[in-house]
Amino acid sequence: MNITKFLNKVYFAPRLKEIEQYAPLPLQESFDNAGVQVGDVNQPATGALLCLDVTGEVVDEAIEMGCNLIVSHHPLAFKAFKSLTGSTYIERCMMKACKYDLVIYAAHTNLDNAAGGVNFRLAELIGLENVRVLSPQKGALLK
């Protein structure tokens, strides 16, 4: 989905902060890697592509559509790289994103755990009542 008009003549950082106000990064699980995966958030936005998973095809589509922001639910990389050589699929996606000045941003378990986030919305859609947190995160208000 191209939301170019929404992002026209704005910078990423303030828009990404809006996402993080709704789904704060501290709500992510310890295994997760939500937030900016790669890219310079201080560049002007040309458009955004939303996806569930970042793939090579998604990166190519963003480039073809002139979108320099990819917002994904699942992170492209869950762990830090020791080197970036292009020897793996994920590394090649990251390198191509860098080459074309793309920003990749993931809102994963922080969005799942947010009040009104994915899990709350799914519960609402299937008609659950009295929805409550089953296992609160230590130091967090919601899970």
Regions found by a protein language model. Give the residues of each.
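Hydrophobic structural segments
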Residues: M1-K143
